[in-house]
């Protein structure tokens, strides 16, 4: 079993680790804080003796888990998350190439994109052009992403699981996560 942390770390005041997720702030004890922190930048295997703690984090929405392993596990963990830019990124990365293109989609699209949607854009070779970005580009972007076949709940996620662009996009997202 693998897991990936969700949410943002809130600055410590009294030594307690706090995590913000979906408008709520969670205070974590030492065990759960260590588990959350270890999977903050990359998926991690769930330690057998700590599975109970990971389950509690998942119930709170602070981690997502999967029984899969390898590239499919990374995809499933990321597809269960909405990808949002951090307000103030401390990391540095090149805006050139694939990483920069994906970053521009994440930063400037008129809606929050999922890993599946980003894979679809990569598969199509769609660049983040002004007519597809921002509030004004939201409708056109949605039409680019979805067809009558993929608009059904879970259809795009299932289709993108088998995309040749999947592993490359997942690698870019993990690099951006480290850079942020």
Task: List the predicted regions and their residue ranges.
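Short boundary/linker motifs that mark transitions into or out of structured domains
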Residues: 1-20
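Long, charge-rich, low-complexity alpha-helical segments
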Residues: 22-180
